[in-house]
Amino acid sequence: GTPSIAGGLGLGEAASFLKKIGLKNIEIRERELCNRLIDKLKAIPGVQIFAPPNPLYRIGVISFTVDGMLPHEVATYLDDESDIMVRSGMHCADLLLRKIGCPNGTIRASLAFYNTESDIDTLVATIRDMLL
């Protein structure tokens, strides 16, 4: 078939973009955002977080549940109320999630270096509003 020249050029530009920012800078930023989200979610009664306790072993993906609500309900509320997109369900890890006591799955927020503190604050505020 025809090679994807546009795809190759796009990949090259993406690599250049990341190199300019610096992978270490991206790692530091994502860790800061991840820690902020976890700290704020921990402060909400009924929210259970599934993440390594040591921040050095975390990545920018945080899984959590909200007591008394299905993950899909939480994801739909976040989308409807604040245009926040998260993943909900079993995340292709049914056996693991059942083993850790999440038979309905979890909500998974994915953070990237381009997210802002405001993005996290909006997500947390929306969850708080949902629980009122």
Briefly describe each language-model feature range:
Residues 1-132:
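Pyridoxal 5′-phosphate
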